[in-house]
Amino acid sequence: HHAYVHGVKKLLLLGSSCIYPRDSPQPMKEEYLLTGPLEPTNEWYAVAKIAGIKMCQAYRRQYGCDFIAAMPTNLYGPNDNFDLQTAHVLAALLRLFHEAREQGTPPTLWGTGAPRREFLHVDDCADACLFLMDRYSDAMIMNVGAGQDIAIAELAALVAEVVGYRGDMQWD
């Protein structure tokens, strides 16, 4: 509301791909928003992001504000979080395989490895945000990503190779 009150000319809300239904087809498309149940483990975070999107759309409709919303895919890059309790998938895999190599024990990976995810470097996300601020003005949310996804099992194999881990991996 304060952006409107203070006459902000353009506002970009960054959301998250968690706004899409848990069982969304891959790759996720903007029109999948609100078409099914959210992932229960981050449902309230997703609801807060969706509320922000809807607020941008409401201010655009009611007051003509140039408020837009972008949904970056899974990001990675400098200053990533490698804490296994809170890290996102790529940083967590890097940490797991590094520790497995150092300790000589196979890592236990979560799930089956079948889900697919898309990844984007933070610098590419920043470039996309600047592009959107300069050239995009629409109520429809805009996904920001590379347009290519990878199975978690494939990603795990790539990370193991990069880290130099040559042992087995276990899926729970």
What does each model-found stretch correspond to?
Residues 13-14, 143:
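Rossmann-fold scaffold of SDR-type NAD(P)-dependent oxidoreductases
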Residues 42-45, 73-88, 111-123, 146-148:
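Glycine-rich "substrate-gating" loop/helix at the edge of Rossmann-like oxidoreductase active sites
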Residues 5, 9-10, 18-69, 74-76, ...:
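Catalytic helix-loop patch of NAD(P)-dependent Rossmann-fold dehydrogenases
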Residues 3, 60, 97, 132-133:
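Hydrophobic pocket-lining residues that define ligand/cofactor binding sites across diverse proteins
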Residues 93, 99-172:
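C-terminal substrate-binding subdomain of Rossmann-fold SDR/epimerase-dehydratase oxidoreductases
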Residues 1-8, 94:
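Amphipathic alpha-helical dimer-interface segment in Rossmann-like NAD(P)H-dependent oxidoreductases
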